[in-house]
Regions:
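Conserved beta-strand-centric core segments of catalytic alpha/beta enzyme folds
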Residues: 1-3, 7-14, 53, 57, ...
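Conserved beta-ketoacyl condensing-enzyme motif
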Residues: 1-71, 75
């Protein structure tokens, strides 16, 4: 597993720990929407170095950023809609609009979404668990709240 996948996988484990009941949903009702600024560039650089000798298939597998979604999905048996977007910076408005559309059109009942960025020794992760049926202690799913939480986690 490359470092981007490790970061996303670990952030997801913290997100779901003690706060998520997957049994409430069918696997196809749980999706993942992630984004970052550098795609899989950290691993792409490592892969490029291996091509000077013999290209490493083990590294090539991780030259797509959406592999992190696959690793999370396999771990938790999530089978719903998923997408990975590349933006210059965290775009809470896009995340809110995209995930809301998936929920409003009954494509998903639950979505893990957010930002998973890693390049060399710098990394940022902010994941959000969005459920169509809100609990009493839920925070409203708005771009303002996403931005506020992202900034608290990442400065």
């Amino acid at each position: 597993m490359d470092n981007l996948c490790k970061l996303g996988w670990l952030a997801n484990e913290f997100l779901l720990k003690d706060s998520f009941d997957a049994e409430k949903y069918k696997p196809e009702d749980i999706g993942i929407v992630l984004s970052n600024a550098n795609a899989s560039l950290d691993n792409d650089i490592k892969y490029l170095e291996t091509t000077k000798e013999i290209a490493s298939p083990a590294l090539f597998v991780y030259t797509l950023p959406n592999i992190v979604i696959g690793e999370i999905s396999i771990r938790h048996t999530f089978k719903g809609e998923n997408a990975f977007f590349i933006f210059e910076k965290f775009d809470a408005g896009f995340i809110e609009q995209y995930v809301s559309n998936l929920m409003d059109n009954d494509i998903l009942q639950c979505c893990i979404c957010g930002w998973v960025e890693l390049l060399k020794d710098e990394y940022k992760a902010a994941l959000f668990l969005i459920e169509k049926d809100k609990s009493t202690d839920s925070v409203n799913f708005t771009k303002e709240n996403l931005t506020k939480i992202y900034q608290l986690q990442n400065g």
